[in-house]
């Protein structure tokens, strides 16, 4: 959903950037047997949860699955603008 909103109202990406991102998602799928849709959904949900606690720059966000031997690691690089004083819905 967030991806759709970004496409309609958001940033312009070059066709090379879009092709590179699609290729990266295909390679991740091949190596980890995870669909590109799964990875995109994971990224959107991470944005939703992390945004409760801090303001982030979604444009610079990078979420990947890396494989080494028989292990898979989720690696997220998320630029943080600032921390929020209290989490939304916090009981404090």
Swiss-Prot record:
Q: Which SUPFAM superfamilies match?
A: Cell division protein MinE topological specificity domain
* Protein name, as recorded: Cell division topological specificity factor
The UniProt entry, under Gene3D superfamilies, shows: Cell division topological specificity factor MinE
Q: Which Pfam families match?
A: MinE (PF03776)
Key word Disulfide bond present in the record? no
A GO BP annotation: regulation of division septum assembly
Name the job this protein performs: Prevents the cell division inhibition by proteins MinC and MinD at internal division sites while permitting inhibition at polar sites. This ensures cell division at the proper site by restricting the formation of a division septum at the midpoint of the long axis of the cell.
What is the source species?
A: Symbiobacterium thermophilum (strain DSM 24528 / JCM 14929 / IAM 14863 / T)
Question: Has UniProt tagged this entry with the keyword Cell division?
Answer: yes
Domain of life, per UniProt, equals Bacteria
Alphabetically list the UniProt keywords: Cell cycle, Cell division
Which family, according to the similarity comment?
A: Belongs to the MinE family.
Q: Which InterPro entries match?
A: MinE, MinE_sf
